[in-house]
């Protein structure tokens, strides 16, 4: 029997996964949109009216405040989700004459080592993408699903049918944020109905109860999944990282973090007249061109100093161990010499004894 080609099987499965991810993107988008719409319709037609009270002016005022918040959150979800889907993540500017000249020179080179060199373009270190056969700026990575290099690529998301990158990352993160707050709002209104017995009155049908149960379960799953995923991305934004950069070993991880967490959030969400300006569901163009990113030199120097200190400590330990080994070797040599001398003495004494005996 022939041996199984494990690498070939893994590669084939990976290729099939990429095809599914590439061509089934609309299916994931349609499923997510349908689930969000189902929860929204159930909330506004069943859950929200059941929890409203018009007995006095205070409850009437509370009703309009509650309705305004609900409508605003719903608008924030759909706006950011649509913008995350239709906004391109950003690709390297291949129309530049300078970059085209560099690409042609590299492609014409017969030496493969030239393609591994770092390119300096406008005082920025660019690398070379072997799959695209073109130059790419820092933090730009090649997406195997889209088959393109993406500026400041974070990851390929099937739920938006494309990559999350420089130009649509803000919309993606705000979509997660608005969605998580919204499902919290839905659960806060639906749980009293489920456990308070209101749904079992004659006022509601079996379909109403089923819709509320499905919406509550979907909201709870979204609460856990989106909460953990959104919290991870909040950490990435606050530390100036992307999902890909977070996978690097700490010592090899480039540090693009700014002076404070606030600055890191503002560079992604935007800065306005108010503290909440970056959270508003509005059109926004990120700061910069997606190619030029400044490293935090102070932290890089600290990391290098720490590495140098560790290397120095390791060298001192090695030197100490070598000295101990040398001392041990010298001691062993001295012992061997003493043993040889003793052997000679013993043999000499034995000869002398034999002579006297004769």
Swiss-Prot record:
Record: glycosylation sites: 255, 296
Locations listed in the record: Membrane
Low complexity bias locations: 305-332
Record's GO cellular component terms: endoplasmic reticulum; Golgi apparatus; membrane
Membrane topology reported for the UniProt record: Multi-pass membrane protein
Pfam families listed in its UniProt record: DHHC
Record EC number: 2.3.1.225
GO biological process: protein targeting to membrane
Catalytic reaction equation(s): L-cysteinyl-[protein] + hexadecanoyl-CoA = S-hexadecanoyl-L-cysteinyl-[protein] + CoA
Keywords: Acyltransferase, Glycoprotein, Lipoprotein, Membrane, Palmitate, Transferase, Transmembrane, Transmembrane helix
Signal peptide region: none
Residues annotated as transmembrane: 28-48, 57-77, 171-191, 210-230
UniProt GO molecular function: protein-cysteine S-palmitoyltransferase activity
Main localization, broad class: membrane
Domain topic, free-text comment: The DHHC domain is required for palmitoyltransferase activity.
Stated family: Belongs to the DHHC palmitoyltransferase family.
Protein's recorded name: Putative ZDHHC-type palmitoyltransferase 4
């Amino acid at each position: 029997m022939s041996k199984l080609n494990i690498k070939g099987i893994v590669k084939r499965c990976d290729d099939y996964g990429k095809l599914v991810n590439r061509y089934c993107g609309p299916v994931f988008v349609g499923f997510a949109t349908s689930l969000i719409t189902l929860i929204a319709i159930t909330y506004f037609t069943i859950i929200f009216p059941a929890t409203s009270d018009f007995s006095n002016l205070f409850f009437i005022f509370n009703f309009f405040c509650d309705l305004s918040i609900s409508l605003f959150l719903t608008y924030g979800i759909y706006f950011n989700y649509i913008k995350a889907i239709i906004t391109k993540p950003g690709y390297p500017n291949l129309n530049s004459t300078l970059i085209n000249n560099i690409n042609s020179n590299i492609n014409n080179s017969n030496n493969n080592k030239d393609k591994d060199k770092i390119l300096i373009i406008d005082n920025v270190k660019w690398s070379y993408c072997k799959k695209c056969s073109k130059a790419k700026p820092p933090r730009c990575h090649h997406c195997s699903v889209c088959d393109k290099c993406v500026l400041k690529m974070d990851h390929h998301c099937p739920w938006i049918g494309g990559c999350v990158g420089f130009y649509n990352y803000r919309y993606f993160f705000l979509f997660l944020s608005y969605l998580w707050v919204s499902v919290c709002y839905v659960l806060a209104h639906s749980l009293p109905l489920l456990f308070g017995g209101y749904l079992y009155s004659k006022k509601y049908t079996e379909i109403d109860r089923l819709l509320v149960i499905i919406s509550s379960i979907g909201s709870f799953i979204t609460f856990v999944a989106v909460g953990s995923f959104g919290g991870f991305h909040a950490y990435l934004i606050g530390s100036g990282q992307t999902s890909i950069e977070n996978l690097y070993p700490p010592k090899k991880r480039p540090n693009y973090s700014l002076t404070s967490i606030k600055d890191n959030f503002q560079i992604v969400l935007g800065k306005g007249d108010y503290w909440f300006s970056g959270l508003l569901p509005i059109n926004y163009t990120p700061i910069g061109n997606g190619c030029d990113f400044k490293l935090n030199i102070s932290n890089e120097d600290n990391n290098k100093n720490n590495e140098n200190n560790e290397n120095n400590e390791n060298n001192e330990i090695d030197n100490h161990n070598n000295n101990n080994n040398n001392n041990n070797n010298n001691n062993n040599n001295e012992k061997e010499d003493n043993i040889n001398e003793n052997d000679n003495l013993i043999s000499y004494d034995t000869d002398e004894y034999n002579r006297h005996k004769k």
